Swiss-Prot record:
GO molecular function: 1-pyrroline-5-carboxylate dehydrogenase activity
Gene this protein is translated from: rocA
Annotated SUPFAM superfamilies: ALDH-like
Family the entry assigns: Belongs to the aldehyde dehydrogenase family. RocA subfamily.
Residues annotated as catalytic: E286, C320
Enzyme Commission code(s) on record: 1.2.1.88
Protein name (Swiss-Prot/TrEMBL): 1-pyrroline-5-carboxylate dehydrogenase
Keyword GTP-binding: no
Biological or metabolic pathway of the protein: Amino-acid degradation; L-proline degradation into L-glutamate; L-glutamate from L-proline: step 2/2
GO biological process terms on file: glutamate biosynthetic process; proline catabolic process to glutamate
HAMAP family named among the record's database cross-references: RocA
UniProt keywords, alphabetically: NAD, Oxidoreductase
Length: 515
């Protein structure tokens, strides 16, 4: 008997036992730093001379692991293995596939702090952010397993006298999963298991900044009983391995999470039909956002300020859902801005391994350079209220940065920065605020802080984002509670952690029998 789904509780680190357990997990992870990790193709460990070196973004000299790097030849080998495995994996009972997810979730739950501690080191996540990432990975496994059990017999359709009609779902084929570094466990695991539980085989190309956590998860799936060849772990260059697999005639679908530019490139390439290809590839893409929090004159201003700070600076603003635009009605603009600046100045930036750190580093040198360039642009486009400094001598640290009086069409109000930078703009009234909120090419998340029911209802209709929050921040969607995914250039309108997500990984078949 499968229990009803409930999200995984977050760890309370004010409890000393939990704090000690996490410190022990950090020591365990530190003892394993610098190891070599192979590719996994058909269950075989394959070692290459060329490596992806994963480093700690809070301490550039600390190597997390050296991961073998796939090339085109190994990608082709993995494709052949996955294509062959699909023939029998697609016929495995959905109940058996769901059971593997349940077992994997149980394994991760037992090793929860270990996975979180690894993300503290590999992704630079503070304790709470890492803990939430692991909890979300567990949630995806638990939720998608249950969703597959709901979908396994299809959906009832009508039948006439003397006729029986059945409508059910079958797997697609080989899926290429290209996962991001910002949720290196949750999104990587979620996109992978959604593909697997629906009966597809997977080539997993994790982000080059965070490949070790993906390897550890591949090991978990093996331990949970996933047969060899169903999941193949092949980190490598996007330009070499990524393009090759997106173009491959045997690739049936691509599940991508990452930047707008790479998403567009994948979407374009996947549309081309190559010799030997007998289907149109499907692309499931989540591509980022330029997310705003709107504050009305009838808002709880303390709640507004705290929501902006948490959403803008949690995990250094490196979330596609992060608040990078604060759109404040002019009546309360100065009060909200000044309180946000006060709160921002109180944030502790430092090594995420220290429990008291609110904000750690950004992920790597190129991210650091890009964000610092945007801060320079911001100094021209707005009034720097706090932050603006960076230090990449030891790790990639940037102070949380607030710009005021920014034009709604300015670059820092329109372009995704993916760092700890929030821009404030003033709206004449609530209607004007909504107009500004909708004036980007994205449509992922947004929030409205207001006590005015009519304004909330207006926003419900008119604020064009996939995830809209009232009287809270715009980050932190929970699997099964707030299905996640956006509109416009934020992706293909898919909703991860939602009731229709698995269907994107399957195709429907109708069988009609006369008697």
């Amino acid at each position: 008997m499968v229990q009803p789904y409930k999200h995984e509780p977050l760890t309370d680190f004010t409890v000393e036992a939990n704090r000690k357990a996490f410190e022990e997990a950090l020591k365990k992870v530190e003892a394993e730093l610098g190891k070599d990790y192979p590719l996994i193709i058909g269950g075989e460990r394959v070692t290459t001379d060329e490596k992806i070196v994963s480093i700690n973004p809070a301490n550039k000299t600390e190597v997390i692991g050296r991961v073998s790097k796939a090339n085109k030849e190994l990608a082709e080998k993995a494709m052949k293995v996955a294509d062959e495995a699909f023939k029998w994996w697609s016929k495995t009972k959905p109940e058996a596939r769901a059971d593997i997810l349940f077992r994997a979730a149980a394994i991760v739950r037992r090793r929860k702090h270990e996975f979180s501690a690894l993300m503290v080191k590999e992704a630079g996540k503070p304790w709470k952010e890492a803990d939430a990432d692991t909890a979300e990975a567990i949630d995806f496994m638990e939720y998608y397993a249950r969703q597959m059990l709901k979908l396994k017999d299809g959906v009832p359709v009508e039948s006439r006298p003397g006729e029986t009609n059945r409508f059910f779902y079958i797997p697609l084929g080989v899926g290429v999963v290209i996962s991001p570094w910002n949720f290196p466990f949750a999104i990587m695991a979620g996109t992978t298991v959604a593909s697997l539980v629906t009966g597809n085989t997977v080539l997993l190309k994790p982000a080059s900044a965070t490949p070790v956590v993906a390897y550890k998860f591949a090991e978990v799936l093996e331990e949970a009983g996933l047969p060899a060849g169903v999941l193949n772990y092949i980190p490598g260059s996007g330009a070499e391995v990524g393009d090759y697999l997106v173009d491959h005639p045997r690739t049936r679908f691509i599940s991508f999470t990452g930047s707008r530019d790479v998403g567009i490139r994948i979407y374009e390439r996947a549309a081309k039909v190559h010799p030997g290809q007998i289907w149109l590839k499907r692309v499931i893409a989540e591509m980022g956002g330029k997310d705003g929090i709107v504050v009305d004159k009838e808002a709880d201003l303390e709640l507004a300020a705290q929501s902006i700070v948490a959403s803008a600076f949690g995990f250094s603003g490196q979330k596609c859902s992060a608040c990078s635009r604060a759109i404040i009605v002019e009546d309360v603009y100065d009060q909200v801005l000044n309180r946000v600046v006060e709160l921002t100045k109180q944030l502790k930036v430092g090594d995420p391994a220290d429990q008291s750190t609110f904000m750690g580093p950004v992920i790597d040198q190129s991210a650091y350079n890009k964000i610092m360039e945007y801060i320079e642009i911001g100094k021209k486009e707005g009034r720097l209220m706090t932050g603006g400094e960076g230090d990449d001598s030891k790790g990639f640290f940037i102070q949380p940065t607030v710009f005021a009086d920014v034009d709604p069409n300015a670059r820092i109000m329109q372009e995704e920065i993916f760092g700890p930078v929030v821009a404030f703009t003033k709206a004449k009234d609530f209607d004007h605020a909504l107009e500004i909120a909708n004036n980007t090419e994205y449509g992922l998340t947004g929030a409205v802080i207001s006590r005015n029911r009519a304004n909330l209802e207006k926003a419900r209709e008119e604020f064009h984002v996939g995830n809209l929050y009232f009287n809270r921040g715009c980050t932190g969607a929970i699997v099964g509670y707030q299905p996640f995914g956006g509109f416009n250039m934020s992706g293909t309108d898919s909703k991860a952690g939602g009731p229709d997500y698995l269907i994107l990984h399957m195709q429907a078949k109708t069988v009609s029998e006369m008697f």
